[in-house]
Amino acid sequence: VYLYTSNPDIATGDGIAIAPDSKAVSTAYGRTLARALTTLGATGDAGQVTRIPKAGSVAAPVVIAVGLGDAAPPPEGLRRAAGNAVRAAAGMESVTLALPATSEDELRAVTEGALFGAYAFATYRKKSAKAHKPPVKAVTVATALAKDKDAAAVVTSVKTVAKSLHLVRD
């Protein structure tokens, strides 16, 4: 999953800017990413989701760009962006989020958004069950905090809350 922003101070010639934490995806995709996103109507507005096929050395079959709006969104903005990205990936087995998650608060927000967004209630769907795409089963958050013990505790806590939330929603 890929994230971008529409901040005019850092926008590219294509009118959008790649969020700093997603530069690795941009590099792997190639120089055409911003142009392709713009062609598809991506503006970087908060909550906007744009799916684009893979290119370059990107291993994932699809890149999902989610607008942040501002260059430095608050945790709630990250939570919503992660949820939007994971919901847009419905039907896929797994997703990797390249979202800003450089602090424990950001990591918590991204993880909550992803795990809360991965919920889908389909128990009573009979006619529409075949048309319903199952939620993502596995989420990875790409972060420099991956080996931090406190960050691991944050993720464990969020997993517990998400599991409980899914149970209550059912």
How would you name each of these model-derived features?
Residues 1-170:
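Glycine-/small-residue-enriched capping loops at alpha/beta junctions
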